[in-house]
Structures are given as C-alpha cells and as structure tokens.
C-alpha cells in the first residue's frame, strides 16, 4: 500500500539526485520514509536517498518495493509547477502508479523490482578529511575543471588548512583554493584523490547551489558527498570511486 501527496519541487529534487546516475531504480516505501539506493552500470558512482514521511503533505506506506523508469516519472513530475501538489497512489492489483497533478491524471506502468539491478552496499569508510562547503563553490570548481580536463583532483593541504579542486590538461591547468575562511567547516587530514569529472558533473547537476555539502575525502579512496533538501527532511549521499594512479 502506498498513497501520498508531495510538493512538486520536493519530488523533482529527489528524482534528480538519482536520475543523474541511473535510468531505473527500486523505491522502498517504508512507513517512515521513502528510500532509494542505486549504483551506475559501471559500479563507479552510487547514490543513497531518503525522504522522510514529514516531507510529504500526507504519506501512507507499508514497506513495499516498486521499480520505476526514472525518465518517465521525471517527465510526469516535470508537468507540475514548483508550487503544485502531486498525488501518488499505487494500485497493487495492476502494479501501476496513479499520479494526479492539477487535474492531469497519469497511470505509470511499473517495472518488476527483481529485474532491476541489486541495490549496492555503501561502505562505511574512515576518511581523514571532512570539508563542508556551499554547493555553489563545488559548481565553480567543477565548471573550471571541465574547461581543461576530464579528470578532477580533490585534495586537502593539512599545513595550509585549505581544500583544493584541481585539473590538469594537456596544455592548461586549473586550481581552485578554498581556505578555511572560505569553507563552512574543515577537518583537515591526509586527502588527495583523482576522479572522473563526468561523474562529478552529473552529481553536481543535482546539488542545489545553496546546499551545505559535506565532502568526506581520503588518499586514493572514494569520495562521499552529503547534502540535504526539502528543508532538511530529504537526505542524499553520493559516493564516487577514485581513479587509482600508478607510479
């Protein structure tokens, strides 16, 4: 059983954070929250999303799991204006999701959850550095890096107490230095890892510019990026595997 009413912008933000990595996913409809966990086909990027029941205007669920085509669901949600309410109801007999937006009714065929890739385990990593920064600063660094390279280096200088976003191209280099005073918070430890810029660009599309983003970073370890939405009732964690550099 699943029946809910949610603000359009809240649903759109939730779907955006997952669709940047995968085309289809399982949605777990628990009684206290809606949750999604997915990994891209190359096993490089992961997303873990929870949206608390309190983020909805109304929410009833009993622990079921549905499979959805994210592009179709996003297209439907995109028909709504940001202030609209979206009504969602699962028909358990037909296994279809009934959606209503301001007089528009849509019935979405669901996917068998067993045919969708298994949800990943997101490891509990002990990462030495934690950087808290505005989403706009991450966007600035990624946009600059994209001008010169398809890889991006994230590192922390413990002595300088600064966070660096760097990219090195064939002829040009980019280096964004964010000192402690430019950050919301910094726990400095040994951290220096190289990542695929394409994946970070995709993740960055979902991160609001005014979001407070917590970055967990280590030495040639995956990076974790955490941020909230829906007035703190929605939570997203991205994890991205590093590119290991041979000596």
Curated annotation (Swiss-Prot):
Molecular function terms from GO: DNA binding; DNA polymerase processivity factor activity
Family to which the UniProt record says this protein belongs: Belongs to the PCNA family.
Pfam families, per database record: PCNA_C, PCNA_N
InterPro entries the UniProt entry points to: DNA_clamp_sf (IPR046938), Pr_cel_nuc_antig (IPR000730), Pr_cel_nuc_antig_C (IPR022649), Pr_cel_nuc_antig_N (IPR022648)
Subunit structure: Homotrimer. The subunits circularize to form a toroid; DNA passes through its center. Replication factor C (RFC) is required to load the toroid on the DNA.
GO biological process assignments: leading strand elongation; regulation of DNA replication
Role according to the record: Sliding clamp subunit that acts as a moving platform for DNA processing. Responsible for tethering the catalytic subunit of DNA polymerase and other proteins to DNA during high-speed replication.
This protein's name: DNA polymerase sliding clamp
Keywords, alphabetical: DNA replication, DNA-binding
Membrane spanning residue stretches: none
Organism per entry: Halorubrum lacusprofundi (strain ATCC 49239 / DSM 5036 / JCM 8891 / ACAM 34)
Encoding gene per record: pcn
